[in-house]
Structure formats: structure tokens, C-alpha cells
Amino acid sequence: MERGAAAAGALSCTFRSPSPSPTSPAAPHWRPLLGFRSRSRSRGRGWGQRAVVAGAPRLFLPPPCRRFRYCSQSKLLGTNKGQNRCSLATFSSFGQSGISLNNEDLVKDKLLIDCGEDQDCVIDGIVALGKFDALHIGHRELAMYASKAGTPFLLSFVGIAEVLGWEYRPPIVAQCDRKRVLTSWAPYCKNVVPIEYQVEFSKVRYLTPRQFVERLSRDLKIQGVVAGENYRFGYRASGDAAELVKLCEEFGLSAFIVRSVMDTARSYNGVTTSVNSSDKGQVSSSRVRHALAMGDMEYVSELLGRKHRLVLTVKENHLQERKRIMLPKSCMLNMPPADGLYENCDLLNGGHLGLCRVIINSETIVIEMKDENSLLPNTIQENQQLGIEFG
């Protein structure tokens, strides 16, 4: 769990809920991706009819992963963007949970913090597991499959760098901008906005893989999990996807293991030289950071599935002219691209202010508007947040 940040003890956590979609369900409910057996330990004919893509091969893994099949659907990144290749290996197991759904228990144990009337919001949900720092297309794929199986949630961890003593790096997505990004995923998630559920890493750092899954089942009372094939969890990342499936079966949860979304441009500009030894060509946050460091915004957009948005908070020492704004780099709330000149950008302040070009140097960010009438007096004010989307 050290590097994979994959454990969940819901002792101290914050719940971040985007604005509900008009088509979002009023309460969590189970929408099966495939047919599942009933909540009985009976083997035999208890299995439902499984909707498997014609011609898709079966995936056989050693015990205890006894029943897996492929549901072929995916997106490959690169020049041939229309091709699909990612697969979903699915295992489902239900047992008698013996779990009370009494909200008083949740409140008493302080499992969900500041959820208001939605104290039972995560109950019976399908939780996608990961770091979700970049919210890239691989993360979106996990949310998409979670929505096929039920009400989608993202379970991520905060404070990892501080706990492990890593050097500070600005986030790829500004914290205040995550809600917008998740809302943009609704068309991929059956018009449901995934809800992000964050846990303090310091509270779960030493959980074993078994304790992690037990917390998901006993404390959060979820219905199932979705994870990538390279997912690691538990203390010192000691658990892998196969063990996750085994433990989910034991605790009566469904487990959906999704193949990585591959980056067909993985050798582009030497990107593979910048990522860690576990990289096998999959879309990753490390690739996004490297592409930003190269200043290749087209490649960044492909990895993210959207334009990269740099968010800034206007400070009192900003300089505004008729067509020009100058801000210190200390205004930035997330990772910028490399120093340089960027054409065809968009400036936003809740609405669209206009097209601009952006010049980033070692100390400042200069925004030059295409239209001299875009920046009227008092358009930009102190403590206001601005967004720059790079074309």
C-alpha cells in the first residue's frame, strides 16, 4: 500500500459529492453488468445468464479466481483512436453479509464525515479503487465499468506524499476542479456523475490486504469493487488483483478487474524513459506529468481525454492591462506545462472570457488576449479563480 496507496479504513475521510445529474438515481441501487447468482452459497445452477461479447475469449486464472470472462470494450490511445482493445475480466461472489445498514452505526463510528443526509451514500455502491490523481482516461474507464455494475464511486487517498516523505509535486488536477472533471464523465457512466470518496492515507497505511477488504465490506457496506489489473493494496502494496478477487469472494463482494488502457504512442518523445519500472505502456499519471513537462499539450489531451486546465487564484500583485494579465507562478493550484509559449488557449472565470496565448517562464504566467475587448475594467479581481485550457 505504500506506493499503490491502496487501502481503505474509513476512520477519517472526507466525502466530495458533485452536483447530482438529473438522471442520477435517488438512492444507490444495483444495476448488474452481468447476470449474477443470488445471495446464496449454493453453487450449481444459481448462476445467472452472462452477457458476454460474441467471440470474446475466456480468461482463466488459477484458484481462487474461479470464474472470469472477458467483456471486450475499450479505447486505445494513439493515431488509430477508433480501435478498441481493453477488456474487463469479471468475477462475482455473494455471501451472507450479516451487515446492519443502520445509519446510527455509521454516525456512531464516524465512518462517513460531513455527508449530511447522505450518510448511507456509499452503501451498496460499486467502488473504483486507485489514486485518481490525474483523472485520466484509464481512471475514467474504471468509473465507466463501475457504473455498469451499480452506483459508481471513486475511493482515493489523500496525504500520501506527506506520510511517505515524498517530494512535493503540484497535483495534475486542482482540487477545486475535480468536481467539474467528474461531471464531464457522466456520458460515459450512464449519465451518472461518479462520486469521489477520499480517505486519509495516514489512517489506513498499515492495514493488511485482508483488513482493507474487511473495512470495505463491514464499514462502508459496498456492493463491489472495480480495480485495474496492476492494482496493489495493503501495507507495502502486498496485495494484488488476484488477492483482491479472493478476499472479495470471502467477504461477499463483487470484484471487477479491468485491463489497463494502453498508450499506443508510448515511445513518443522518449516517454518510456521517464516512467517507473512497472510501466508496460499503459496510460498513467506519470505519462501525463512527463507530457506536461515536455509541453506537448496535444499528447496531454489524449491521455486525459480532455484539455488540461491550469487553475490560478488571482493575487493582489497581479498586473492587468488592456489585453494582458501577468500573474506570479505562486498563483497556480496545479501543475503547469513546461515554460514556453502556448497558442490557442481559452481563458475562463466561470464563463469563457476569450481566446488567448499564454507565456510561461520561471517566475510568471502572462496571458495575452486575442480580443482587446475581452478584459473590461474589473473583469479580473483579487481572490478570483481563473482557468487556462490549453489547446
UniProtKB/Swiss-Prot annotation:
Give the disulfide map. none
Gene Ontology biological process terms from the UniProt entry: FAD biosynthetic process; riboflavin biosynthetic process
Q: Where is this region: Disordered?
A: 1-31
One function term, GO molecular function aspect: ATP binding
| Domain of life the protein comes from | Eukaryota
EC number(s) given by UniProt: 2.7.7.2
Cross-referenced InterPro entries:
FAD_synthase, Rossmann-like_a/b/a_fold
Q: Where is the transit peptide?
A: 1-53
| Chief site of localization | plastid
Which reactions does this protein catalyse? Answer: FMN + ATP + H(+) = FAD + diphosphate
Cofactor list: Mg(2+)
**Gene Ontology CC terms:** chloroplast
* This protein's UniProt keywords: ATP-binding, Chloroplast, FAD, Flavoprotein, FMN, Nucleotide-binding, Nucleotidyltransferase, Plastid, Transferase, Transit peptide
Please name the top-level EC class of this enzyme: transferase
Pathway(s)? Cofactor biosynthesis; FAD biosynthesis; FAD from FMN: step 1/1
Entry's localization field: Plastid, Chloroplast
As for what it does, the entry says:
Catalyzes the adenylation of flavin mononucleotide (FMN) to form flavin adenine dinucleotide (FAD) coenzyme.
What protein name applies here? FAD synthetase, chloroplastic
Protein species of origin = Oryza sativa subsp. japonica (Rice)
Q: What gene name is listed for this protein?
A: RIBF
